Amino acid sequence: MSGSEVLIYAYGAVCLSMIMFNMIYNIVLRKKEPETTMKAQKIKEALLKKYSADSDTGTTEWETVRVQAFLKEEDLELGKSEDLLTFSEAVSLLAEEGLEEAAEGMIRGLQPLLPALSEDYLKKDKMQTAYFAVFLEKFRRRSEYDSALLESLLKYAVQENMYCRINALDALYAFGNAEYVVKAVEKQDKMDAFLHEKVLTEGLLSFSGDHRELIKELIRRFEEFKVKTKLAILNYIRFKSEDCKEFMYKIMTDEEEDRELRFAAVRYFGRYPWEQARSVLIEFASDKEVLHWEYAAVAAAALKDYRGDGVLSALKTALYSSNWYVRYNAAVSLEAAGMSYNRLIDVMAGNDRYAREMMEYRLEERKLVKERELQKEGKSE
């Protein structure tokens, strides 16, 4: 089994585990749904009644003591996952019915209670811990209690339970604190059960804070991480910032660097064309060494938006490769360069069967795509 296959299967396993979490969670919800829904509706009505009375007096903010009194009146203990779920649904119902102000008043009054609850849920069954991380992501608001909650989430993020880890990381991304996200990445990097890099990349992309600050801090700590974490970071940077060219160029041209990291850097320059990177990409794409086919394939794709001396020549050279992926990427990039059938006649009429067949394949593929688009347009009329 190749390394790429292992990565695909590992990523699939992580995705499957999260699907299983959602399925189990939904099954539990269905079993308790009638009772929970009825109770949530009752809590919502009680909240609305309080809000209406407060509106008459001009006071819509809930102090913590009032929140605690309300919870006691309604026999809700947020330390119990069933009651936490009921409360969550009740507040969500308010917001869904256009009563966001009423919901927000309660949520803000709840903030001082969250640190103690977060520590309490850490001691519970990890599925409950995982759910509380979701609760925090949804109901935490920026306050003086953030530092305590961030520390709790770091503890959640190092649990062996995968659901707990991923939910905790999602909450940390939602908090938008770059310092703590980097701390969480560092902890994931050191764990035996590593979080798949695609999951980590997608999480970083969802970060709600300043991406420039997060990227700066990740680059500063870059050499401290293992290769898999580095790869996740590079892919994140590729999607979020065009201001890291010098950093990426150094990785791309470092022959001692891990090849997967170099590939990531090459892809970066495919997304953000840079004149200084052009000659290196041309060199990679023109490399006829069979063992270097991956460099040639990635570089051929990256040259799609480059023009100037050497680019077309390198792509035509890549089109003669014995490797299908190199040929395909070269053909796509030649098309992107705007080369028509007539301009590619030297390739089509040449003696190299691989190159000729690939261009024929791409031209036929493009024709089929256009036909499908025309069919869709015809159906929509």
Region annotations inferred by a language model:
Residues 72-78, 107-121, 144-155, 177-188, ...:
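Amphipathic alpha-helical scaffolding segments comprising HEAT/armadillo-like alpha-solenoid repeats
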Residues 98-108, 130-142, 166-175, 196-209, ...:
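Structural detector for internal amphipathic alpha-helices that build alpha-solenoid repeat scaffolds
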Residues 1-41:
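N-terminal signal-anchor transmembrane alpha helix of single-pass membrane proteins
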Residues 124-125, 157-162, 192-193, 225-226, ...:
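Short inter-helical turns and helix N-cap capping residues of alpha-solenoid HEAT/ARM repeat scaffolds
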Residues 77-177:
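Membrane-proximal soluble helical/coiled-coil segments
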Residues 25-123:
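N-terminal topogenic membrane-targeting module
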Residues 154-166, 170-202, 206-213, 222-225:
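Long, contiguous interaction/recruitment modules in multidomain scaffold/adaptor proteins
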Residues 1-7, 286, 360-381:
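Short, Lys/Arg-enriched, disordered terminal segments
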